């Protein structure tokens, strides 16, 4: 059985606007040896499965600086530091990024974003009966294109690697499990 490692100390290394870097000195319970681990502390994130009455998903295209590619994704973003409700954040992000609003917003699932190096959680929120209601409200660092994609096309887009953002693929997996009645919400 795996035992959690004992943390001896933790010290901040840097503060970089969207995340903080810290160094944790821990003891390996198996060997007793000390090791430094670097952890990125970030606010939690939300991904939005926005389903229209016509069985389409509201999706966005945007340039991603890490990969240097334009990605096909679902709407989402970072929870503001004062926000505690991922469902409310998802409703806000959907409206700001796409102008869409819907009904029956609810949590579909949550995952550790990357437990090897990140301390945060990514929440997937389902919003049904989404319709275009408002103009978009991009912040100065956003440039997105909104499009509607038939739900039936999603598996092939993932298989063809047209949807390649790992957290989006996980969110779409939650959606698939919900559609098949395996994931209850």
Where are the regions that the model predicts?
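Acidic, metal-coordinating catalytic segment for phosphate/diphosphate chemistry
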Residues: 11-47, 53
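A short coil-to-beta-strand element that immediately follows conserved catalytic motifs
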Residues: 101-108
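Conserved Nudix-box catalytic region and its N-terminal flanking loop in Nudix hydrolases
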Residues: 2, 37, 47-92, 138-140
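Extreme N-terminal tail/first-helix region
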Residues: 1-15
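Short, solvent-exposed loop/turn elements at beta->coil junctions and helix N-caps
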Residues: 11-12, 109-114
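Active-site-adjacent beta-strand/loop module that shapes the phosphate/pyrophosphate-binding cleft
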Residues: 25-30, 114-133
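Short, well-ordered beta-strand micro-motif
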Residues: 23-25, 50, 126-128, 148-150, ...
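Nudix hydrolase/Nudix homology domain
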Residues: 2-5, 33, 70, 116-118, ...
């Amino acid at each position: 059985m795996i035992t959690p490692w004992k943390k001896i100390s933790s010290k901040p290394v840097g503060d970089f606007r969207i995340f903080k870097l810290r160094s944790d000195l821990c003891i390996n319970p198996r060997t007793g040896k000390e090791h430094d681990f670097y952890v990125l502390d970030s606010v939690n994130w939300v991904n939005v499965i926005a389903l229209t009455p016509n069985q389409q998903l509201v999706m966005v295209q945007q340039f991603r600086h890490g990969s240097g590619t334009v990605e096909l994704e679902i709407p989402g973003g970072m929870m503001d530091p004062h926000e505690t409700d991922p469902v409310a954040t998802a409703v806000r992000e959907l409206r700001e990024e796409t102008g869409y609003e819907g009904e029956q917003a609810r949590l579909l699932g949550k995952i550790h974003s990357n437990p090897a190096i990140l301390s945060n959680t990514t929440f997937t929120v389902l919003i049904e009966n989404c319709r275009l209601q408002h103009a978009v409200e991009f912040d100065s660092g956003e440039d997105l294109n909104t499009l509607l994609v038939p739900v039936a096309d999603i598996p092939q887009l993932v298989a063809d690697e047209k949807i390649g953002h790992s957290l989006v693929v996980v969110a779409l997996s939650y959606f698939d499990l919900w559609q098949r009645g395996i994931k209850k919400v």
